[in-house]
């Protein structure tokens, strides 16, 4: 009889990697938030358009999950990135922390489904799309209660597409590039990203 029990051993690098991703993206988010604010006059014409810009905020969880592939890595990275952004004066304050949790859980769930083993492009695209869906629910309730049904559908579609493309596809491209350059300390190996 085989033991299929998931055994997890954390090394220092398994914690340092999500933290480094988080700090980098916390700073990036501050800059991206400024760009997002500059685009506000254009997106205010039809608010659901803002959803198409959201996938970038999902990157810490997707990257940490792909690189470390251990329970909690995506959550640690996304929540810490949100904390850094909020601490540096991000415009959304404490709501950023709630978003951090909401944005990390779909990646954690997707990795759990594959027992934290091989995480390929399909997994990260699905995780990105699910993250977009989850974040759309949170933002619809918290920030956009005025949306009519049609606006809500458009917003959800934009969030899901953005999560899959700006989140999932970009994360996959970054990890693939890092693996090809042999800059990752562990999984995925270059053969995992072909």
Q: What do the PLM-derived regions correspond to, one by one?
A:
Residues 2-64:
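Hydrophobic transmembrane alpha-helices
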Residues 15-19, 55, 59, 75-76, ...:
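Hydrophobic alpha-helical transmembrane segments
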Residues 81-111, 142-143:
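Interfacial aromatic-anchored transmembrane helix boundaries in multi-pass membrane proteins
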Residues 136-146:
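Hydrophobic alpha-helical transmembrane segments in multi-pass integral membrane proteins
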């Amino acid at each position: 009889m085989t033991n299929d029990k998931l055994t997890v051993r954390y090394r220092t690098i398994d914690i340092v990697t999500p933290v480094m991703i988080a700090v980098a993206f916390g700073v990036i988010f501050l800059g991206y938030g400024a760009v997002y604010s500059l685009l506000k006059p254009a997106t205010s014409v039809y608010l659901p358009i803002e959803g198409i810009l959201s996938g970038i905020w999902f990157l810490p969880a997707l990257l940490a999950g792909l690189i470390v592939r251990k329970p909690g890595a995506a959550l640690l990275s996304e929540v810490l990135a949100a904390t850094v952004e909020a601490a540096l004066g991000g415009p959304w304050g404490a709501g950023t922390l709630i978003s951090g949790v909401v944005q990390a859980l779909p990646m954690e769930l997707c990795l759990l489904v594959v027992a934290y083993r091989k995480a390929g492009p399909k997994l990260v695209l699905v995780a990105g799309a699910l993250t977009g869906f989850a974040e759309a629910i949170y933002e619809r309730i918290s920030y956009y209660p005025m949306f009519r049904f049609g606006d809500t559908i458009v917003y959800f579609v934009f969030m899901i597409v953005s999560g899959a493309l700006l989140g999932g596809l970009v994360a996959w491209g970054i990890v693939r590039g890092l693996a090809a350059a042999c800059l990752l300390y562990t999984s995925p190996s270059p053969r995992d990203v072909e």
